[in-house]
A protein has these predicted regions:
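Long Lys/Arg-rich low-complexity intrinsically disordered regions in nucleic-acid-associated proteins
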Residues: 1-189
Length: 189
C-alpha cells in the first residue's frame, strides 16, 4: 500500500472481470486505487477489486468493466453478482454510504462481518477502528449471533456497528457496546 499521494489516472479506469475477480493492470490506475484504499495490490501493476468496490467505482464513472471483450454495465454486473451473493446490494449500499462519507472501507474479518472501516486519513497508518455488520430492516437477527459478532469485534479491539438498510435504501448505523450484553443487562451491577 502506498502512503504517498499518487496522481489521478485517466478516468474511467479499465478493468477486467475474470470469474469472481475484477482486476486492474494499468500502473497509474493501480497506484491511485491502492493509495485510496481500493482493492488488494498484488504487484506494481495489479490490483484486484472486491465486487462492491467495482460497483462503487462504476457508479462514480471511474471504472469501466469488461468481460470476455464486452463491456458490462452496472446493472448487468449487479445481476451476475446477485446470483452468487444475495447480500451484494445491501453490501454495496453500505459501502457506498461509508465511502461517500469519507471512510476507507475494506472487507470484514469473518463471522459475517461485512466491512472493516478506517477513519478518514487513518488508512495505511492506523488499524481499522470499526467493524460493520449489515442487515436489511425487518430481517431477524438472533441474539446469540449478535453476541458472537460483538465478542469477535471486541477480541479484535474494534467497535461494532450494525448498519440497517430500510426498503428505501436509507441506512441507520447503531454502535453496539458490550454493556448491552454484559452483567448490567442481567441486573448484576
Amino acid at each position: 500500500m502506498s502512503v504517498e499521494t499518487s496522481k489521478e489516472p485517466k478516468f474511467p479506469i479499465l478493468a477486467e472481470k475474470s470469474r469472481d475477480e475484477v482486476y486492474v493492470t494499468d500502473r497509474e490506475a493501480v497506484e491511485w486505487l491502492d493509495s485510496k484504499g481500493y482493492g488488494f495490490r498484488f504487484r506494481e501493476d495489479l490490483v484486484v477489486l472486491r465486487p462492491f468496490e467495482a460497483l462503487y467505482l462504476m457508479s462514480q464513472n471511474k471504472l469501466v468493466l469488461s468481460y470476455k471483450s464486452k463491456q458490462l454495465l452496472f446493472n448487468q454486473y449487479l445481476k451476475i453478482l446477485e446470483k452468487a451473493d444475495s447480500k451484494i446490494w445491501l453490501r454495496y449500499l453500505i459501502y457506498k454510504d461509508l465511502r461517500d462519507k469519507g471512510y476507507v472501507v475494506k472487507d470484514g474479518y469473518g463471522f459475517d462481518i461485512d466491512f472493516k472501516v478506517y477513519e478518514a486519513g487513518d488508512y495505511g497508518s492506523k488499524p481499522a477502528k470499526y467493524l460493520v455488520y449489515g442487515v436489511a430492516e425487518g430481517t431477524p437477527l438472533p441474539v446469540m449471533k449478535l453476541y458472537n459478532i460483538l465478542r469477535h469485534s471486541y477480541s479484535l479491539r474494534k467497535t461494532l456497528i450494525i448498519a440497517t438498510v430500510d426498503r428505501r435504501s436509507e441506512i441507520v448505523y447503531y454502535m453496539l457496546s458490550s454493556l448491552l450484553l454484559g452483567k448490567e443487562t442481567r441486573g448484576e451491577q
